[in-house]
């Protein structure tokens, strides 16, 4: 289960209590379940990364890859954004703010690579935005085609920083994959992104505290926070990464890789799921002998 944010969703209590066990994929979600439905058994098990695919490549291999896929980028800082083009992902805001960043450092100093659909019905027309802003000469590059995980891993390696400024994010796999490849991240401190950017002692990029919080919702979800960032803090974060030396960025990324391998590795992930399923089956039964469940009920007929 994943729930992106507080305030605590008391309206979920009846749903939580209809389960024998809930597995939370983020620390935020784990806290929410334990607070809203403390009587229900729950455990924390986050996403994991396949280290055989998402790993650091040699400098020589990445130099060849950059020259092939991103020509004329050798002296430029590459920022990577790998998300769906949807409203909460803040794709349009990022492009506008990246333009302001380029106005400071120079159009020939950095590139933004966006692996997404340019005209997703749930997002903005990104092509129209770059044309309007006059950054349609290679300053922003779009990657729309589906690509193999191995190629995606090389893009993470080629990038100097991966960005996720979503106003709501259950976990955020792209930034986790980036850290596994040794590339630091810029993230909004919301949802599962908070546990990726720091282990409580070290930081693996730039974590941005929300500038403001808005309560949004719907008929089914009466309330939830939406964590928003301002133009100023995002531009400052881009500048901070840009002004670092390659060695400083590499150090952040290497620390991030250790964080991922320790806390989000596939070996522990598979082992924990096996333990969870086995323990749940032993404790609660299966379809034929499930405990705490009746397939029938009595009702009065008049």
What are the residue ranges of the model-derived segments?
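Short hydrophobic beta-strand element within catalytic cores of glycosyltransferases
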Residues: 184-187, 197-198, 204-207
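Glycosyltransferase donor-sugar binding loop
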Residues: 109-126, 145
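Acidic anion/phosphate-binding donor-loop and adjacent secondary structure
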Residues: 10-11, 34, 49-68, 124
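Nucleotide-activated donor-binding/catalytic signature segment of Leloir-type glycosyltransferases, i.e.
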Residues: 123-150, 154
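Carbohydrate-associated surface elements
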Residues: 28, 48
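Conserved donor-binding/catalytic core segment of Leloir-type glycosyltransferases
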Residues: 72-89, 95-98, 112-113
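Aromatic "clamp/platform" in nucleotide-sugar-dependent glycosyltransferases that forms part
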Residues: 167
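C-terminal amphipathic helix plus adjacent low-complexity
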Residues: 215-227, 231-302
């Amino acid at each position: 289960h994943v729930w992106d944010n507080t305030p605590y969703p008391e309206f979920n209590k009846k749903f939580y209590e209809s389960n024998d066990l809930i597995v939370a994929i983020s620390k935020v979600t784990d806290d929410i379940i334990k607070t809203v439905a403390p009587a229900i058994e729950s455990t924390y098990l986050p996403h994991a990364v396949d280290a055989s695919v998402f790993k650091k490549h040699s400098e020589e291999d990445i130099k060849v890859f950059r020259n092939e896929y991103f020509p004329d980028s050798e002296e430029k800082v590459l920022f990577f954004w790998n998300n769906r083009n949807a409203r909460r992902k803040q794709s349009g805001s990022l492009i506008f703010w990246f333009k302001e960043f380029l106005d400071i450092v120079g159009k020939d100093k950095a590139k933004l690579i966006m692996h997404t659909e340019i005209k997703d019905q749930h997002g903005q027309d990104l092509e129209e935005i770059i044309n309007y802003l006059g950054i349609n000469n290679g300053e922003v590059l779009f990657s729309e085609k589906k690509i193999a995980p191995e190629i995606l891993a090389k893009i993470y390696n080629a990038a100097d920083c991966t960005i996720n400024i979503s106003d709501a994010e259950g976990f955020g796999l792209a930034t986790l994959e980036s850290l596994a490849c040794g590339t630091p991240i810029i993230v909004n401190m919301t949802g599962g992104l908070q546990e990726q950017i720091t282990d409580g002692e070290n930081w693996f990029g730039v974590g941005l505290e929300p500038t403001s919080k808005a309560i949004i919702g719907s008929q089914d979800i009466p309330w939830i926070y939406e964590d928003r960032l301002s133009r100023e803090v995002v531009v400052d974060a881009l500048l901070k990464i840009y002004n670092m030396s390659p060695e400083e960025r590499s150090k952040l990324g290497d620390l991030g890789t250790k964080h991922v391998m320790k806390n989000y590795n596939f070996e522990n992930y598979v082992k924990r799921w096996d333990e969870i399923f086995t323990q749940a089956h032993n404790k609660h039964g299966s379809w034929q002998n499930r405990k705490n469940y009746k397939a029938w009920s009595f009702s009065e007929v008049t």
